[in-house]
């Protein structure tokens, strides 16, 4: 593992116990989402995981950003994918969050690895699925090459919703774990079927779909999916767990990893759950 910032190496993705807290786009309640400040804040409070969305710039640099549009998160305009890395670095990715973060720059994936490889487990949401197989293959290989450069294979896992992307990941990088994400307008059971077909070790439930699933199943979908997944040896992530009562409910139903924008609150609730239930 090579990086210029010496520090503690944590347990890897196979060893780290559950339930875990995954800081969604970093600790995005206290710092601009998907920036080094947000990831650093998540690591500082001891989150086991951080989640990030990875895009490729016009000149081939892999960067972290949820939006492909620049307007919400920066002082720029247009599509991230149409800008070079230098053009993106000239933009301010902090000013719209708070004046205190003025001057915050977009982070490349290599910068993130250089600082945090081995210090936090990374849930890597792959994007660009609409750009075709050839592009996607090159994009994935570039990300895998960076992960291998920093020896972070056991501290990362890929999250993708498209079954063809999951198959491609299985072929290109079988050594890196995969997580199957949900797709709009697909039946509830399809998520686990897709995960098993593509050798995924995790699934990621998405709370905006829960009402539709509840109507489809006629019962609580979280308990149903967690039970089915665990019977197959599959880990369950859930996105998003921001509300305290819902978070407690998700933990009680056996959700393994909680993606959250309120990392410290969710961490407190998780720790209380562990103490009360004598876990660990």
Q: What are the residue ranges of the model-derived segments?
A:
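Phosphate-group recognition and catalysis centered on beta-loop-alpha active-site segments
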Residues: 1-280
